[in-house]
Amino acid sequence: RFNGPREGPVTLQHGDFRLDNILFDVQGGKARMGTLDWQTVSCGHGATDVSYFLSAGLPYDVRRAHEQDLVRIYHEELKGFGVKDYDWDTCWRDYKASAVHGVFMGVFSAIAVERTERSDALFLAMTRGGCVQALDHGAFDLWA
């Protein structure tokens, strides 16, 4: 069960990490990127932000074709920065279980934010992306 106590490294999670919340080449090129909208920050598994980023930002077929390679790169980078005791299988499981985050974000955002044509389309896409990813990985079963 994924909704019980979890072990492993935790980090600062953005919670709404998607392309709309990232600026590139900021401060006149002094910084390569900056991240906006920190209202949903929390502590947890970093794989949640990775999972949400891919479900909210990639077409389903592209995500399916490349997600395991992208998550492996993420895992290798963690190890390169000194994260220990977080094996690939645990990282991949955290990633898959975190797919429900996209569902939560899409639904809760649609409830909390003023409706516009753009926000309706955005939240529908976020929810669909999260649902498809969660179904692809059996994430709802991991939370049972």
What would you call each of these model-derived segments?
Residues R1-H14, D25-G28, M126, Q133-A144:
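ATP-dependent phospho-/nucleotidyl transfer catalytic cores
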Residues V83-R93, G102-A144:
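Helical subdomain adjoining the active site within ATP-dependent kinase catalytic cores
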Residues R6, V10, G15, C43-G46, ...:
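Active-site-proximal structural scaffolding
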Residues F17-L19, K30-M33, W92, S98, ...:
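Active-site lining segments that contact anionic ligands and/or coordinate catalytic metals
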Residues R18-A56:
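Catalytic activation segment of kinase domains across protein kinase-like and atypical kinase folds
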Residues R1-F2, G15-R18, L23-F24, W38, ...:
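Tryptophan-centric aromatic hotspots in well-structured domains and transmembrane helices
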Residues P9, V62, H66, D87, ...:
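Conserved acidic
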Residues T40-V83, A99-A121:
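Active-site activation/catalytic loop segments of kinase-like enzymes and analogous catalytic loops
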